């Protein structure tokens, strides 16, 4: 059993991009930025508990941080992990809330 404290630290934010929007509309898949050390089981449990939905599959990938320049200085952004969470048919996550 995964502790609730850990589940709250697994998901960082939804990842909003053109690709993630298309995937959400066509395949009922939500993209999240997750902790680098998070496992697929932890991501699945966190999404199911926090959003009260049924998760079908979870696919994860490590994203390499980009190299950035500021004049002569060269820096690097941190590496991060992305998770594609496919929900079962009929399930949906409403990030906007119930604004009436």
UniProtKB/Swiss-Prot annotation:
Superkingdom of the organism of origin: Bacteria
PROSITE patterns attached to this UniProt entry: RIBOSOMAL_L23
Gene Ontology terms for molecular function: rRNA binding; structural constituent of ribosome
GO BP, sorted A to Z: translation
Pfam families given in the database record: Ribosomal_L23
Keywords: Ribonucleoprotein, Ribosomal protein, RNA-binding, rRNA-binding
Record's protein name: Large ribosomal subunit protein uL23
Species assigned in the record: Aeromonas hydrophila subsp. hydrophila (strain ATCC 7966 / DSM 30187 / BCRC 13018 / CCUG 14551 / JCM 1027 / KCTC 2358 / NCIMB 9240 / NCTC 8049)
Recorded name of the encoding gene: rplW
């Amino acid at each position: 059993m995964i502790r609730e404290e850990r589940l709250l630290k697994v998901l960082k934010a939804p990842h909003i991009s053109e690709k993630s929007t298309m995937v959400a509309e066509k395949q009922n898949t939500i993209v999240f930025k997750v902790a680098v050390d998070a496992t697929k089981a932890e991501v699945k449990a966190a999404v199911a508990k926090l959003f009260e939905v049924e998760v079908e599959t979870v696919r994860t990938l490590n994203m390499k941080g980009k190299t950035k320049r500021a004049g002569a200085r060269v820096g690097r952004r941190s590496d991060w992990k992305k998770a594609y969470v496919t929900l079962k048919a009929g399930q949906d996550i409403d990030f906007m809330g119930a604004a009436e």
